[in-house]
């Protein structure tokens, strides 16, 4: 059995950057790292929503993206993400497999219930914490000057309409994970990525965290 890692946090918090860095770091350590994220699924759902009943384009705002109007699609996307993980190509030796699962939600306890078949009590969790103003600033910067496929636009609307429920009280969330799913508290970690943190400092913390969880298999 390999390692399952959930990377969670608000859009613009730095979770995608963290997930990419962990994947690269793990491969240098000879792990078979695979990353699963729900954005691709949501984007496909948006493209199929020809009548714009569940999504709305953000082209009027000058960006190629979408807003979610029907929040039920968030659950549907997680169901599909779970399905894709279960149907992934199996490795001959999965002992050094690292599955990185990445998404943002307003209620992580409810979101995690879609992944109960993965053996959550053995999984690891990394929350990326950042002020909303910092998240929005990063989103604008990355949308104006994209450098990776993760550099997508997210509007202010979805922060106000949906993500406002995520108060980023991740210590409280950790206790809920422990009580509901039996996840050990020492499997849950949070990294602050506010405006006072440099990119180098952030990646140093991310790498130290990744090194700790990968040591389990060394």
Residue ranges and their predicted role:
Residues 13-14:
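Conserved glycine(s) of the Walker
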Residues 63-120:
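Glycine-rich phosphate-binding loop used to anchor ATP phosphates in small-molecule kinases
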Residues 22-28, 112-122, 140, 144:
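Short, surface-exposed basic-aromatic patches at helix termini and helix-loop junctions that form
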Residues 7:
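Hydrophobic anchor at the beta1->P-loop junction of P-loop NTPases
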Residues 164-218:
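NTP-dependent small-molecule kinase module
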Residues 10:
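P-loop (Walker A) phosphate-binding loop of NTP-binding proteins
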Residues 17-83:
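Conserved substrate/cofactor phosphate-moiety recognition/catalytic segment
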Residues 120-173:
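A glycine- and Lys/Arg-enriched "phosphate-lid" helix/loop adjacent to the NTP-binding pocket
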